[in-house]
Amino acid sequence: MNTDIKNLIWIDLEMTGLNPNIHKIIEIATLITDKNLKILSYGPVIAIYQNNHQLSFMDPWNNKMHTKNGLITRIKNSLYTEHLAEIKTITFLKKWVPKNTSPMCGNSISTDRQFLFKYMPTLEKYFHYRQIDVSTIKELALRWKPKIYNKLKKKTLIKH
């Protein structure tokens, strides 16, 4: 493991919805890449316990998807609170990236950042204030290079 200020932290949250004032984080996953996007390490993937009342705020589509992929069962059986998940994630990140050096990287990351600010503030403060949002790159590609975007979109759909 090499701590390097140029390494990037990629994060993905699953939530019961998109409003941090109502909804909760139900899963957190991270990975580390170098500056050239080579994956260096996968971080912990942690289902976060939420009670049935909190889970009831999920819309039918979310509920169906997370039931089908097993996340609801993992949430109900999880021993992790938001705080414990935050500690475990930070412990992993410290092995690879110094505090305040990596932008927050991911897809539609501003939503994740809002949830971290509310429920995992120490983790949110671990990141640099900047962010690399893949959804921004997708939107720009769609507008500037639609042929390339559509070609990549087809490849992604075929893989899944």
UniProtKB/Swiss-Prot annotation:
Cite the Exonuclease domain residue spans from the record. 8-158
Q: Which GO terms describe its cellular component?
A: cytoplasm
Q: Which is a GO BP term held by this UniProt record? A: DNA metabolic process
Keyword Hydrolase assigned: yes
What InterPro entries does this protein's entry cite? Exonuclease_RNaseT/DNA_pol3, Oligoribonuclease, RNaseH-like_sf, RNaseH_sf
Annotated EC: 3.1.15.-
Alphabetically ordered keywords of this record? Cytoplasm, Exonuclease, Hydrolase, Nuclease
* Gene Ontology MF, one: 3'-5'-RNA exonuclease activity
- Read off the SMART domains from this record: EXOIII (SM00479)
Which compartments does it reside in? Answer: Cytoplasm
Coarse class of the primary localization is cytoplasm
Catalytic residue list: Y129
Q: Which PANTHER family match?
A: OLIGORIBONUCLEASE, MITOCHONDRIAL (PTHR11046:SF0)
State what this protein does: 3'-to-5' exoribonuclease specific for small oligoribonucleotides.
Q: Which family does it belong to?
A: Belongs to the oligoribonuclease family.
Instruction: Please give the name of this protein.
Output: Oligoribonuclease
